[in-house]
From Swiss-Prot:
Statement: the UniProt record of this protein carries the keyword Lyase: yes
Function of the protein: Bifunctional enzyme that catalyzes the formation of 4-diphosphocytidyl-2-C-methyl-D-erythritol from CTP and 2-C-methyl-D-erythritol 4-phosphate (MEP) (IspD), and catalyzes the conversion of 4-diphosphocytidyl-2-C-methyl-D-erythritol 2-phosphate (CDP-ME2P) to 2-C-methyl-D-erythritol 2,4-cyclodiphosphate (ME-CPP) with a corresponding release of cytidine 5-monophosphate (CMP) (IspF).
Enzyme nomenclature, EC number: 2.7.7.60, 4.6.1.12
PROSITE patterns attached to this UniProt entry: ISPF (PS01350)
Name used for this protein in its record: Bifunctional enzyme IspD/IspF
Catalyzed reactions per annotation: 2-C-methyl-D-erythritol 4-phosphate + CTP + H(+) = 4-CDP-2-C-methyl-D-erythritol + diphosphate; 4-CDP-2-C-methyl-D-erythritol 2-phosphate = 2-C-methyl-D-erythritol 2,4-cyclic diphosphate + CMP
Region (2-C-methyl-D-erythritol 2,4-cyclodiphosphate synthase): 238-398
InterPro entries: IspD, IspD/F, IspD/TarI, MECDP_synthase, MECDP_synthase_CS, MECDP_synthase_sf, Nucleotide-diphossugar_trans
Pathway of action: Isoprenoid biosynthesis; isopentenyl diphosphate biosynthesis via DXP pathway; isopentenyl diphosphate from 1-deoxy-D-xylulose 5-phosphate: step 2/6; Isoprenoid biosynthesis; isopentenyl diphosphate biosynthesis via DXP pathway; isopentenyl diphosphate from 1-deoxy-D-xylulose 5-phosphate: step 4/6
Length: 398
């Protein structure tokens, strides 16, 4: 039987220790090309066991938060936090009450590298009577210091550093937070401490050394290096395909890849009927999951009558650039009995080089016949297939 597991992501802090030069809270500073909170939220969104996500933010951060997470706006709930972490957590728990989850993760918004493996290990350890805490053994020698002098060395045996997410049965941790508020107990540094105080047992599991919390300015350097390494290991390369077909009508030229080709017929279409650029536009849109050319430029709209298909291609390209995409290569196959494409291939490649800003070795344009089969074989029209490979920032999700 499946269980319902929610997540509360705490992002209401000001992050003064991280030292932002632009006074931007650290969770909204860029890591790679996306804010830290974007990376954190993504980790929970992509895990199939997480049913509900509550994002607790500072009241002044709603606009910047909504901008940072615009593409996910339907997939999480924003709750305003309080003056302390403990109060913010209670706000998140109270907002979750109507969803009645069985368990809840409570996670620091400034820990962007939580992996599915750790979440799975937590879920496999859950019971209705216990919470789960990921921990790491302390490797440094610990000293108790007073006024810059060492008082004693503290044995490391049985000492661990705590990470988040910390996961709890929902009702007990909500009750613990409510009880702490009632008795004005406000000095807890994490939710595990509240659970301990309330009498809820906490079982530990091995944490992940890469699951760092970005607290100090130097932590950004560590995070950037780790992200770069991850991107090199699992680059987010996406492949899109496009297909288009247009019939012939009377005319004296047609346009392919933006190049005018003399012919005794032209292609019938609402725009200039550049079947090759239409297929390529669809291929590029596919890498963003952005629909097809008809979604953006409906043929029922008279403003696109007889316009150059380069407009459509440049629009798709702008969507790629907004997401930080870079074209790795494009491949177009024109399927036609006539006209012959060979004499115009070089001009087509040069035109695409200009539009796409890529080198010719990343552009393939070729043609084939349909061996006189079907409507293409009968010379009734032209079809085109296109494939595009685009590299986006970030890594491939697990």
């Amino acid at each position: 039987m499946s269980i319902s597991i929610a997540a509360i992501i705490l992002a209401a802090g000001r992050g003064e220790r991280a030292g932002s030069p632009h006074k931007i809270p650290k969770q909204y500073r860029l890591l790679g090309k996306k804010p830290i909170i974007y990376h954190t939220v993504c980790r929970f969104l992509r895990h199939p066991a997480i049913t509900t996500i509550i994002l607790v933010i500072h009241p002044e951060d709603r606009q910047i938060c909504e901008q940072a997470l615009a593409e996910f706006k339907e997939r999480f709930i924003i709750v305003e936090g309080g003056s302390t972490r403990q109060i913010s957590t209670l706000h998140g728990l109270q907002a979750l009450k109507k969803f009645n989850p069985q368990y809840v993760h409570i996670h620091d918004g400034a820990r962007p590298f939580i992996e599915n493996e750790l979440l799975d290990n937590i879920h496999n350890t859950l019971t209705p009577q216990e919470g789960v805490l990921p921990v790491l053994p302390i490797s440094d020698t610990l000293k108790r210091v007073n006024h810059q002098y060492v008082l004693e060395t503290i044995p490391r045996t049985h000492l661990y550093s705590a990470q988040t997410p910390q996961c709890f049965p929902f009702e007990p941790i909500l009750a613990a937070h409510k009880q702490a508020k009632r008795v004005c107990k406000e000095d807890f540094t994490d939710d595990c401490a509240i659970a301990e105080w309330f009498g809820l047992p906490m079982r530990t599991i091995p944490g992940d050394p890469h699951n760092i919390k970005i607290t100090w300015h130097k932590d950004f350097d560590t995070a950037h290096l780790y992200l770069q390494k991850k991107m090199q290991m699992f680059p987010d390369i996406r492949v899109g395909n496009g297909y288009d077909v247009h019939s012939f009508e009377e005319g004296d030229f047609l346009i392919l890849c933006g190049i005018r080709i003399p012919f005794h017929k032209k292609l019938n279409g609402h725009s200039d009927a550049d079947v090759a650029l239409h297929a390529l536009t669809d291929a590029l849109l596919a890498t963003r999951g952005a629909g097809d050319i008809g979604t953006h430029f409906p043929p029922s709209d008279p403003q696109w009558k007889n316009v150059s298909s380069e407009i459509f291609l440049r629009h798709a390209l702008s969507l790629l650039k907004q997401a930080g995409g870079r074209i790795a290569n494009v491949d177009i196959t024109v399927i036609a009995e006539n006209p012959k494409i060979g004499p115009y291939r070089h001009a087509m490649i040069e035109n695409l080089m200009t539009i796409l800003a890529i080198t010719p070795d990343r552009i393939s344009i070729k043609a084939t016949t349909n061996e006189r089969l079907g409507f293409i074989g009968r010379g009734e029209g032209i079809a085109a297939l296109a494939t595009a490979s685009v590299l986006y920032p970030g890594e491939i999700p697990q």
